[in-house]
Amino acid sequence: MAQAWAFLLPVLVLGSYVTSLFFPSYISNPLCGGDGGRSLFLCAQAPKDQDPSPAVSTMYKTAFHFQPAKNWMNDPSGPMYFNGIYHEFYQYNLNGPIFGDIVWGHSVSTDLVNWIGLEPALVRDTPSDIDGCWTGSVTILPGGKPIIIYTGGDIDQHQAQNIAFPKNRSDPYLREWIKAPNNPVLRPDEPGMNSIEFRDPTTGWIGPDGLWRMAVGGELNGYSAALLYKSEDFLNWTKVDHPLYSHNGSNMWECPDFFAVLPGNNAGLDLSAAIPQGAKHALKMSVDSVDKYMIGVYDLQRDAFVPDNVVDDRRLWLRIDYGTFYASKSFFDSNKNRRIIWGWSRETDSPSDDLEKGWAGLHTIPRTIWLAGDGKQLLQWPVEEIESLRTNEISHQGIELNKGDLFEIKEVDAFQADVEIDFELASIDDADPFDPSWLLDPEKHCGEAGASVPGGIGPFGLVILASDNMDEHTEVYFRVYKSQEKYMVLMCSDLRRSSLRPDLEKPAYGGFFEFDLEKERKISLRTLIDRSAVESFGGGGRVCITSRVYPAVLADVGRAHIYAFNNGSATVRVPQLSAWTMRKAQVNVEKGWSAI
């Protein structure tokens, strides 16, 4: 239940806005607010009589990202592939574009691109979830039996885990779900546990003893932990006397995810099946407003996760995404033998903007996720199905970019585009020296350097959503540094000039990755532009950055531009540049239900 907990704070006046996400002070019911675990935010909902502005709603609404037709959404919850259908459940407010009154929204798809919106799968109608049906997971039990386990909050805002089953497994859409009569099946009643910091159960897996395991995000004796539980039947659970993993220096871990990966193999692994020799495990947690992870091994004898590298300073932990991305959830796709991950991307405009738009939040494009060949980090790439929306391909080869050059990528829709570009370095001798302290805050370094500050190698990359006079534009680019015997590449997504509006979050996101430039010489960049959502993948998915932008140029049809640029001293060659206009997907087309 990320529930935007890392971002939400109480507000006293509608429209007050800082770089954290604030909400208006409409209190929806007595269950909201109070002391305890909900003290960081207000449950609120929009006034019933306020209609969203059609112009604003459509200007920033995405064309091929997953989001409901209206209202608030946050965490992906329990994605799965079952009987030929992809299911995406998500945290949803039926009543408005503000966080609160959370239920499980439900949509289905056959291709991960076009989605049908259904009735909510879970609503808050029992004592154990009357405060909200928070984040959870789906596990498919032997015999093809899907089961939801999710966090619910009671009237006192204490958290516990609940179970639900499909009412009719022959229904291809699994529209109706029945809650277990013995809910909640897990309470935080062990010594040292915090009843308001106990949420977001993972997908289950089977251990060598044949028992099911599951992890739940929690706080144990003041430490953050992925708490470990065992069960014979997935209904009755016992807490293991030690966590799957814990850390004494970070906040509560939300939305933990635990899955197996094979180095250099982009095929997914099913946790409910035997894990092959040589496999690693990834433990992901949502903390510090971002999604971080560790690579290690699952020690079967100890029944514990053991990181390959223990890093005390969590600023140095690996990141799933370096931008506006949180509460991600992965699942094994048995259809194509891959692991897919989604994340929630919140709005970074103001609460009053969300009220005017009538919607807030979206999910990133589903990504295939796998372990790099060296076993050090996860790689991500948009699922291949998204390419079905490509049209009107534009291709260029052999472009040479000298210092100060701009090359316009014409004849594609600059508002809805997919751009893939390779940058080839003629020389690596001009790379500036690398300062290891930059790893502690790459965003700060992106902001200080900027795309306008020349370097030895770079900045070079893309300028997107640019107005005619460049008053508004977003830069996605690289800088190359020399670090002893290796090279470090900084990837930035700089939003500081993305909009002329002052009331927005406009940071410069950034992340570093190692690159063997002497061997590869080319650095790839793929950027998907979908109106207010921009997702960029650098170095073959080594660094991913999701950005939310709100330029006024979006209202001016046909007036935005995309450029390739170089502002570094060294010449950069572009051996291949391909760009496509992206068609609109059918996202959450209603089928017999008009509330979403």
Curated annotation (Swiss-Prot):
Cysteines paired by S-S bonds: C446-C492
Pfam families according to UniProt: Glyco_hydro_32C (PF08244), Glyco_hydro_32N (PF00251)
Protein name (record): Fructan 1-exohydrolase w2
MF GO annotations: fructan beta-(2,1)-fructosidase activity
Glycosylation sites: N168, N236, N248, N567
Enzyme class: hydrolase
Keyword terms, alphabetized: Disulfide bond, Glycoprotein, Glycosidase, Hydrolase, Signal
Family statement drawn from the similarity comment of this UniProt entry: Belongs to the glycosyl hydrolase 32 family.
Domain of life, per lineage: Eukaryota
InterPro entries named in the record: ConA-like_dom_sf (IPR013320), Fructan_Metab_Enzymes (IPR050551), Glyco_hydro_32 (IPR001362), Glyco_hydro_32_C (IPR013189), Glyco_hydro_32_N (IPR013148), Glyco_hydro_beta-prop_sf (IPR023296)
Biological process, per Gene Ontology: carbohydrate metabolic process
Activity under varying temperature: Optimum temperature is 30-40 degrees Celsius.
Taxonomic source organism: Triticum aestivum (Wheat)
SUPFAM superfamilies associated with the record: Arabinanase/levansucrase/invertase, Concanavalin A-like lectins/glucanases
Mechanisms controlling activity: Inhibited by sucrose.
Catalytic residues of the enzyme: D75
Reaction catalysed by this enzyme: Hydrolysis of terminal, non-reducing (2->1)-linked beta-D-fructofuranose residues in fructans
Job of this protein: Hydrolyzes inulin-type beta-(2,1)-fructans, but not beta-(2,1)-linkages in branched fructans. Has low activity against beta-(2,6)-linked fructans. May play a role as a beta-(2,1)-trimmer during graminan biosynthesis.
